[in-house]
Amino acid sequence: MYLCPRCKERLSYNDYSELREGSCELCGNILDHVEDYFVMFEGEAKKYDFSTFLIGLRAPKENLTKEIELAEKSGVKLRSYKDDFQVALGSKIEAELPYRADFSRPEIVFTVNQENMDYSIWIRPEYLKGRYLKKRRGIPQSPWIKPGKGKEREKSISEYIGLTACDLLKGSDYNFYASGREDVDALMLGNGRPFYVEIKNPRNRTFDPARISEEVLKFSGGGVEVIELSLANPVEIEDMKTLRPDKTYEVGLTIEGKAIDGLEEILKKYSNLRINQKTPRRVLNIRKDKLRERTIRSMEVKQYKDGHLVLVIRAEAGTYIKEFITGDNGRTVPNLKDELDINVKIDYLNVLEVK
């Protein structure tokens, strides 16, 4: 077996011929190419906005296995040539370029593939969090697409926010996550709805929350506003997915027939009311038909005059408020229509708070 002087010295074992020409049968002379990969890294670095990095080496499995076997045979404890290469290249980058190595959460990972002497770049996504307000009805939260028909509505909240952030951070794509969703014809007011955006492969990490908020408002024609925007991390997204915050709604109703006496006192009886809801008929085409148990925390009368009633309802996450009002042909029980023995029409629905 022929070894380069470096590997022969690392192994402290003299039964191998020293390599004079060609490739080392152990490390493939990868350490002789540190300067070459430094130049490649420097060229890639000009394309991205980052401050931290990590070097990786994808070495052939047989080389690493052979290295372990030789180390055991020679009786020495050594650091792998893979680690030596990563340290050598990383140290040169830190010494000559304005970047620092980060072993926990680097913004760029530069990985050399020893088998084909090529390299790859991984760019850490950027995560943003905030709350959005929807000020115009008719905007869906996610793209509204029907098979064979394409988009049937204007752009969605996820597009207004995600495309804007993606453009300003020069990303390749985005993912949008929110804490629940409001109906397409409902407004999202009050303190807004929590959301996160993941920006993939960002070439710009200069975070300007005021600029993003301004551009979202302009892009949506005033229909979507972003507040409390800040940087986040993926752990926070996973935490948000497990939370089930209560929601507070304002519902405008038209009630037919005679006035209801003592309505406020009647509604107090329904605090912490447990209801059973089957999947609403209006979404059966996209959601599985199943039974859910939910809680109406409280109901208050905000206004009641001339057959027009405005209620403020606080409910458990996942409650279908419209169906609680109308009963959805018996698919939600108990429901307000049957409990008050009224004919009712929903005029509007607003979300006031997402805790």
How should these model regions be labeled?
Residues M1-K355:
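Non-catalytic RNA-recognition surface used by pseudouridine synthases
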